[in-house]
């Protein structure tokens, strides 16, 4: 009975997070087609280690830098947990995740990377990143 409930709950979350899961599948196939990937099935989510820099979370998919795979450093551990924090945001916000977190986070990353003014600020002080850290239990 418990297994059946878990399957039903998983199906409901897949539907609740449908926009980001669909984008995650597309991104996965692009990476799988054009580069080597390491896939780790973690039950309710899939970690994909590839040529991406840093991390990206789309529904059930966490895309992480290949160098992070089996790397025990504290920085890598925090980055992986932080990315999983974004996955928790996706679970909470469902279809609103793309607008509330995804777009805002991408704009913040672009501003922080491209303009010196923004680099003077702590990257993780932005609301999307601070909340992901909090959900994942990451302390900086």
Outline where the language-model segments fall.
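Multipass alpha-helical transmembrane domains of eukaryotic endomembrane proteins
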Residues: 66-73
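Short alpha-helix carrying the canonical HExxH Zn2+-binding catalytic motif
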Residues: 73-89
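Catalytic Zn2+-binding segment of zinc metalloproteases
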Residues: 84-101
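Membrane-helix interface segments
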Residues: 3, 75, 92-96
């Amino acid at each position: 009975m418990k297994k059946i409930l878990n399957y039903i709950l998983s199906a409901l979350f897949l539907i609740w997070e449908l926009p980001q899961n669909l984008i995650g599948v597309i991104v996965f196939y692009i990476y799988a087609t054009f580069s080597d990937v390491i896939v780790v099935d973690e039950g309710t989510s899939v970690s994909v280690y590839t040529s991406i820099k840093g991390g990206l979370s789309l529904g059930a998919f966490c895309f992480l830098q290949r160098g992070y795979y089996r790397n025990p450093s504290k920085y890598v551990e925090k980055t992986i947990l932080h990315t999983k924090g974004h996955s928790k945001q996706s679970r909470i916000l469902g279809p609103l995740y793309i607008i509330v977190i995804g777009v805002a986070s991408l704009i913040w990353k672009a501003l922080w990377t491209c303009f010196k003014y923004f680099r003077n600020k702590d990257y993780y002080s932005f609301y999307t990143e601070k909340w992901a850290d909090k959900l994942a239990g990451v302390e900086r």
